Amino acid sequence: MKLKKYATLALSAILALTALTGCGNQADNGDSKKTSGSSKITAKVIEIDLTDEEYAFGVDKEQEDLLKEVNDFIAEIKEDGTLDEICNNYFGDGTPQAVTSGTLDNSKDQLVVATNAAFEPFEYTQGDSYYGIDMEIASRLADKLGKELVIQNMDFDAVCLSVGQQKCDIAMAGLTIKEDRKEYVNFSNPYYSASQRLIVTSDNTDFDSCTDAASIEEILKAEDSSVKVGVQTGTTGQFYCCLLYTSDAADD
């Protein structure tokens, strides 16, 4: 089983960052539509990987036993098909399962999960319930450990920090394994492969002749200030863009 997720950099008259996800295959022809009133905005994905990443969970450094339990659980759900089943709820014909959070209570045996529930289909909310790949994994992990699940929803920048400060046990938020985050958490074994890709308006032909990441980056660096890139703070998309344009400035 190979899981692949594409977090895409979106390019239009104004660039914005969105998340496009897939599980081992491409959905339709890569086009998507957004409707605002009577107008339609159609987008397409440039099918070239700009980065290769792996997602993992960030565990409290003081809880070595929990790290082992998490790694064992990841291996188990990969082996028995549970991870495929969960992904199918979001990328296939399955039904997303609602996950309920308990209330934080230090007198109880709880698994406290730090997340940023604004990253569909990995974590998001509908009403009082949580949904997403990470949230369903969290629910099953808590059951496996015999603990009550408590989900702490916070800004993405605070997710790893809250675990590092022992306010939460584990970070489950579509986290790319990065060296700077290791200051706060011990990463589990990876459970998901990911990549950054560019998404543009369907009538944009600037990148049609591109064959690799270098050719895309050459065009991006040549854009003037009228073209803007929107990113979620603290994500790999932001780090990629900062590195790309910082490197460009250094070369000048």
Which stretches of residues belong to each language-model region?
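C-terminal motif of bacterial Sec signal peptides marking the signal peptidase cleavage site
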Residues: T18-G22
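Bacterial Sec-dependent N-terminal signal peptides
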Residues: M1-A7
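Extracytoplasmic small-molecule ligand-binding "clamshell" domains
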Residues: Y55, D65-F73, I77-D93, D105-L175, ...
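Secondary-structure junction motif
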Residues: F207-A213, L220, K228-L244
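Immediate post-signal peptide segment of exported/extracytoplasmic ligand-binding proteins
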Residues: K34-S39, T95-Y130, A214-S226
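Acidic, polar ligand-binding/catalytic clefts
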Residues: K40-T51, S139, D143, E148-E218
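Bacterial signal peptide processing site
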Residues: G24-Q26
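Conserved small/polar residues in nucleotide/adenosyl-binding loops
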Residues: Y245-D252
